[in-house]
Amino acid sequence: MILTVTLNPSIDISYCLENFNMDTVNRVTDVSKTPGGKGLNVTRVLSQLGDNVVATGLLGGYFGDFIRSGLDALEIRHQFLSIGGETRHCIAVLHEGQQTEILEKGPHITKDEADAFLNHLKLIFDAATIITVSGSLPKGLPSDYYARLISLANHFNKKVVLDCSGEALRSVLKSSAKPTVIKPNLEELTQLIGKPISYSLDELKSTLQQDIFRGIDWVIVSLGAKGAFAKHGNHYYQVTIPKIEVINPVGSGDATVAGIASALEHQLDDTNLLKRANVLGMLNAQETLTGHINLTYYQELISQIQVKEV
């Protein structure tokens, strides 16, 4: 079973407008409200793949109940911890081929709630083999909270796929608690290293050899339309993907995480892990909905992905 962790979930609200006018009334005819947050995008894709997945994290208030109901409607199992604060909204205004986002920070998590969630995980870890940890830390949680969570998972011999950025990721990399996989994009990798990084294979390879990545089994760097570059142990891979028509790229990284987790769960080899991860990211980008894939095109696309050891 794959357990997905979302500590700062949201209700994702999408408003579609032909024109977005400032300082006046904008009337919306097309509105969608869905359970959101990076980890829940991962969850939906895994569910659509047919993998055994359970969602966990922190939910509070009326809007937390809305997310539970939304997952129930999708027949996705969940075991969230209830908190005192209210779960947040994230609003996307789609207009004139552009997307304007308004993101709430979310509830403040108390120390008691933070400790309670780690105890909550101990109770549900047994059935899981793979843990995905995605997204930002809500207010109140220290920057080393993911490191503490990963340390707990390692104690239970669980594989962890981590998808976060900034100080939360930096804290993990500085700690002794290492995840199985991290999936930075090129911008996030640049922030970690503190200097610009090009698409050069030699530069990418030398970057991933730095001490900061020591102890991490897989480092998979997303390069957008250029595919990916990956390190697994002492092996390095260049992933080339075909050109596709992109409808909505939001959530493609989350779909990629779902592919990584699914491949680990099914014990795929390196080549097929990288192919599954990348094809799911591409399938998400071809859909209007975030965290959604159409498996009709799976075989056609995956056959065009090339993985080369370099």
Curated annotation (Swiss-Prot):
It comes from the Bacteria. Signal peptide: none annotated. It is an enzyme of class 2 (transferase). Belongs to the carbohydrate kinase PfkB family. LacC subfamily. Pathway: Carbohydrate metabolism; D-tagatose 6-phosphate degradation; D-glyceraldehyde 3-phosphate and glycerone phosphate from D-tagatose 6-phosphate: step 1/2. GO terms for molecular function: ATP binding; phosphofructokinase activity; tagatose-6-phosphate kinase activity. GO terms for biological process: D-tagatose 6-phosphate catabolic process; lactose catabolic process via tagatose-6-phosphate. The gene is lacC. SUPFAM superfamilies: Ribokinase-like. GO terms for cellular component: cytosol. Its EC number is 2.7.1.144. Pfam families: PfkB. Keywords: ATP-binding, Kinase, Lactose metabolism, Nucleotide-binding, Transferase. InterPro entries: Carboh/pur_kinase_PfkB_CS, LacC, PfkB_dom, Ribokinase-like, Tagatose/fructose_Pkinase. This is Tagatose-6-phosphate kinase. It catalyses: D-tagatofuranose 6-phosphate + ATP = D-tagatofuranose 1,6-bisphosphate + ADP + H(+).
